[in-house]
Amino acid sequence: MAPKKKVTGLIKLQIQAGAANPAPPIGPALGQHGVNIMEFCKAYNAATESQRGNVIPVEITVYEDRSFTFITKTPPAAELIKKAAGVAKGSATPHTVKVAKLTQAQVEEIASTKMEDLNANDIKAAALIIAGTARSMGITVEG
């Protein structure tokens, strides 16, 4: 077995799917670790092509020899909630001004999408996490 490569950095970014380019914030974040920026952009765009229109978080692990690996996550819960509720952004004052409503079924659908990234044992616990995020955005959950 080949010797394990030494990790020199971990970069976390949230990038539009299929739209990574060397401009900020991607270029500077990768440049300071010596990563080939265009190589990452091409690989990321190819990996996220099917999810265009979503913001996809990515964790990039940079190694000593300037090579890298990356793991894409599911879109942020807030983005999925905004899309389901049909609003551009959450409420500026979430506890006084409500901007939209979600049904329990919509919350469970978002929870099942996010399940692999959430620290929850079952879909009910995941739905409660999503409902809490929605509440903090000024979106009420019915049911």
UniProtKB/Swiss-Prot annotation:
Entry superkingdom: Bacteria
A biological-process GO annotation: translation
Modification after translation, per record: One or more lysine residues are methylated.
Record has Nucleotide-binding as a keyword: no
Keyword Acyltransferase listed: no
Keywords per UniProt: Methylation, Ribonucleoprotein, Ribosomal protein, RNA-binding, rRNA-binding
GO MF entries: large ribosomal subunit rRNA binding; structural constituent of ribosome
SUPFAM superfamilies listed in its UniProt record: Ribosomal L11/L12e N-terminal domain (SSF54747), Ribosomal protein L11, C-terminal domain (SSF46906)
Cellular component, GO, one term: cytosolic large ribosomal subunit
InterPro entries the record matches: Ribosomal_uL11, Ribosomal_uL11_bac-typ, Ribosomal_uL11_C, Ribosomal_uL11_C_sf, Ribosomal_uL11_N, Ribosomal_uL11_N_sf
Annotated CDD domains: Ribosomal_L11
Known partners and oligomeric status: Part of the ribosomal stalk of the 50S ribosomal subunit. Interacts with L10 and the large rRNA to form the base of the stalk. L10 forms an elongated spine to which L12 dimers bind in a sequential fashion forming a multimeric L10(L12)X complex.
Family: Belongs to the universal ribosomal protein uL11 family.
Function: Forms part of the ribosomal stalk which helps the ribosome interact with GTP-bound translation factors.
Protein's recorded name: Large ribosomal subunit protein uL11
